[in-house]
Amino acid sequence: MTVNRAIYQHFSQDDIPFIDKGLEWIKRVEDTYAPVLTPFINPHQEQILRVLAGTYGLGYQSSGDFLPTESVRVLLYPDYFEPEISDFEMALLEICYPSKFEQLSHGKILGTIINQLGIDRKLFGDILVDEKRAQIFVNRDFIPLFQDGIRKIGRLPVSLEECPFTDRILSKIDYREREILVSSFRLDALLSSALKLSRNQTSQLIEKKSVQVNYHVVEKSDYQVAVGDLISVRKFGRLKIVKDNGQTCLLYTSPSPRDRT
């Protein structure tokens, strides 16, 4: 396989490790003439992989084409292969718990999985929650690990049971349109206006690695954001820059504090 170096020019330096991994997957498909299934990846990575697959003429199918989710698994494959939903080797686990005592949050579930199981984020996908239920998409091979390793989240006893995809919780993310005054498109300045925090406070959030831009952790307060960027701030939610009106900026924001990173 001849690597087209021009591909790298279309993406940032932060994307290089994932591009390299994507090219490894593509080479494996070409060498084995067999499909390759990725771990769970985010929408930005999915976009990169779609470009790579198109460049090298491989088949491309996302699990999101069957099940609308944010984190997806992708199949790269030769022309003879016809993907089915079972080929993505995903499972949906219901987190059963006594909801009358306390409501599980996205952040608590994520923290338990990362800290208690010590597994990589790419082994599980979206965490879904509503007032009384919670679910998680996982790599099917790791169902026993999740079921045996998670017996309590916070103070609540839990059990994990596989359920059909048709029973999944439907996301209800309420995005609101807001217009804010902006002195510049520096990350700390924009967050200060959007979150109504001081520049010092937003700089501290950035330094603590609590801020992502397009699914990448950004650690520089002077990072320049642009129209189309998706910004996620731990415990504050998300905002997307929709339009630059000169001295003002139009945003879509998720109003409820919710950690989805």
How would you describe each model-predicted region?
Residues E161-L181:
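N-terminal beta-hairpin/loop module of FHA
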Residues Q116, I127, Q135-I143:
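Conserved mixed alpha/beta catalytic, RNA-binding, or beta-rich assembly cores of soluble enzyme
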Residues K235-K240:
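Short, charged beta-turn/beta-strand-edge "cap" motif at the junction between a beta-strand
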Residues M1-D130:
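Electropositive, beta-rich accessory/interaction domains or terminal extensions
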Residues Y252-T261:
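Single conserved hydrophobic/aromatic residue that forms the stacking wall/gate
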Residues R178-V227, D244:
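A basic, amphipathic helix-loop patch mediating RNA/tRNA/ribosome contacts
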